[in-house]
A protein has these predicted regions:
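C-terminal alpha-helical cap/extension of soluble enzyme domains
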Residues: 189, 197-262
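Glycine/small-residue-rich loop that forms an oxyanion/phosphate-binding "nest" at active or ligand-binding sites
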Residues: 81-82, 89-126
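Acidic (Asp/Glu)-rich catalytic clusters
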Residues: 23-28, 72-86, 114-119, 135-145, ...
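Active-site mouth loops of central-metabolism enzymes
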Residues: 2-19, 95-107, 151-162
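Short, well-ordered coil/turn segments that N-cap beta-strands
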Residues: 2-6, 29-31, 85-89, 120-122, ...
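Glycine-rich, proline-tolerant flexible connector loops at the mouths of alpha/beta enzymes
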Residues: 32-80, 131
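Catalytic beta/alpha-barrel core
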Residues: 11, 34-40, 65-70, 117-134, ...
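Histidine/lysine/aspartate-rich catalytic loop segments that bind and position anionic ligands
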Residues: 141-177
Length: 262
């Protein structure tokens, strides 16, 4: 059974933090590392609230602040990232409309993606809803040297199995890999994603399906059996990841060994 590629999304909100996380990601089993350029325009504040959690510990509230567009030197950041990280890189610059943090206009974001592609990354993430002519130009710019992930992210409820599979089939000619991520509110939502991936296994689509929320990690853990081509993981660890639908890269590799997906 062929195992999917493992892509680890780098932690950090500065170029230095992301570059420092890359070797750890590779050590944990990453085939590819994802650089979320949109996170460069954010900073985090951690504030202690008056309440406590279930374990009696002080509750910590995390506040994400957005920086001004001109706070980041895009060209310099991309140059440093591409020269400092040895692993294959997936470049992403997610708009706020799809759960990302890029603060500028869509025209500005496309310019960031153009600069990113010019650095010759192994992969680039291009959302399927980018204006068609602009997206075609980006795909042409990527050429044969940079593979394209055609992505879609739903912040609403998880759709039906037929809708999920149709999403993937409709997008399969828009890139080398289709990434579809859905917000899960419970196990039933996660099961629909799981069943959709299983249904797609008999197709010729190259896909990566996942959920963000309870049960979202099912399609990641069982990705080899579901015919998935790529799985996203993290260097972060902790029990909270399961509720977020995420999984640590090392834990993912161990799970595949235990389940004999090799």
């Amino acid at each position: 059974m062929q195992k999917p590629l493992v892509c680890v999304t780098l932690r950090g909100r500065t170029v230095e933090e992301m570059c420092n996380d890359a070797p750890k990601a590779v050590k944990l089993g990453a085939d590819i590392v994802e650089v979320r350029l949109d996170l460069l325009w954010t900073s985090v504040e951690k504030m202690t609230s008056s309440g406590t959690d279930e374990g009696g510990n002080e509750s910590i509230e995390v506040i994400v602040n957005h920086l001004e567009l001109d706070a980041i030197d895009v060209e310099d950041s991309i140059t440093t990232i591409s020269s400092s990280i040895e692993a294959p890189i997936l470049i992403t610059c997610r708009p706020q409309s799809q759960g990302g943090h890029y603060p500028g206009s869509e025209e500005d974001r496309v310019s960031v993606l153009e600069a990113a592609i010019a650095s010759n990354p192994s992969w680039v993430d291009l959302e399927i809803d980018i204006e068609s002519s602009k997206r075609e130009d980006l795909v042409k710019l990527a050429g044969k040297g940079t593979r394209v992930i055609a992505s879609l992210h739903s912040l609403e409820a998880t759709p039906s199995i037929s809708e999920i599979t149709q999403d993937v089939m409709d997008a399969q000619d828009m890139g080398d890999m289709v990434k579809a991520c859905y917000h899960t509110k419970g196990r039933k939502d996660a099961l629909r994603i799981f069943e959709s991936a299983l249904k797609l296994k008999s197709s010729d689509a190259n896909y990566s399906l996942m959920g963000l929320g309870p049960g979202g990690d099912w399609s990641r853990i069982h990705a080899p059996a579901l015919g998935q081509g790529l799985v996203f993981a993290t260097t972060e660890s902790g029990w909270h990841l399961s509720q977020q639908g995420k999984i640590n890269a090392s834990d993912l590799r161990i799970a595949w060994e235990v389940l004999e997906y090799s």
